[in-house]
Amino acid sequence: MSYIPGQPVTAVVQRVEIHKLRQGENLILGFSIGGGIDQDPSQNPFSEDKTDKVNGWDMTMVTHDQARKRLTKRSEEVVRLLVTRQSLQKAVQQSMLS
């Protein structure tokens, strides 16, 4: 899948809903955040996964810090992601060829 940040793309996406964990008075995701337009994509262990939206917000052209702030927003107990997964895209393409 060829992907150019900020450009429209046709892709197979997966919806993911994360309920944040309560740690004292804080809400936490329970995982680390990697990526962003200002980061080296080869350093991301899931570099084929692209988070397209977080709670309806377009994430295709945000920096790492902007993504972190959106994902860790204190007022949101649930994070709804729209994720493009290249492995899912490949599986769908294979099933269509069979």
UniProtKB/Swiss-Prot annotation:
<keyword id="KW-1003">Cell membrane</keyword>
<keyword id="KW-0539">Nucleus</keyword>
<dbReference type="GO" id="GO:0030178">
    <property type="term" value="P:negative regulation of Wnt signaling pathway"/>
</dbReference>
<feature type="modified residue" description="N-acetylserine">
    <location>
        <position position="2"/>
    </location>
</feature>
<dbReference type="GO" id="GO:0016055">
    <property type="term" value="P:Wnt signaling pathway"/>
</dbReference>
<keyword id="KW-0879">Wnt signaling pathway</keyword>
<keyword id="KW-0007">Acetylation</keyword>
<dbReference type="GO" id="GO:0005886">
    <property type="term" value="C:plasma membrane"/>
</dbReference>
<keyword id="KW-0472">Membrane</keyword>
<dbReference type="InterPro" id="IPR036034">
    <property type="entry name" value="PDZ_sf"/>
</dbReference>
<protein>
    <recommendedName>
        <fullName>Tax1-binding protein 3</fullName>
    </recommendedName>
</protein>
<dbReference type="GO" id="GO:2000009">
    <property type="term" value="P:negative regulation of protein localization to cell surface"/>
</dbReference>
<dbReference type="GO" id="GO:0007266">
    <property type="term" value="P:Rho protein signal transduction"/>
</dbReference>
<dbReference type="GO" id="GO:0005634">
    <property type="term" value="C:nucleus"/>
</dbReference>
<dbReference type="GO" id="GO:0008013">
    <property type="term" value="F:beta-catenin binding"/>
</dbReference>
<comment type="subunit">
    <text>Interacts (via its PDZ domain) with GLS2. Interacts (via its PDZ domain) with RTKN (via the C-terminal region); this interaction facilitates Rho-mediated activation of the FOS serum response element (SRE). Interacts (via PDZ domain) with ARHGEF16. Interacts (via PDZ domain) with KCNJ4 (via C-terminus). Competes with LIN7A for KCNJ4 binding. Interacts (via its PDZ domain) with CTNNB1; this interaction inhibits the transcriptional activity of CTNNB1. Interacts with ADGRB2.</text>
</comment>
<feature type="domain" description="PDZ">
    <location>
        <begin position="12"/>
        <end position="87"/>
    </location>
</feature>
<comment type="function">
    <text>May regulate a number of protein-protein interactions by competing for PDZ domain binding sites. Binds CTNNB1 and may thereby act as an inhibitor of the Wnt signaling pathway. Competes with LIN7A for KCNJ4 binding, and thereby promotes KCNJ4 internalization. May play a role in the Rho signaling pathway.</text>
</comment>
<dbReference type="GO" id="GO:0008285">
    <property type="term" value="P:negative regulation of cell population proliferation"/>
</dbReference>
<dbReference type="GO" id="GO:0005737">
    <property type="term" value="C:cytoplasm"/>
</dbReference>
<keyword id="KW-0963">Cytoplasm</keyword>
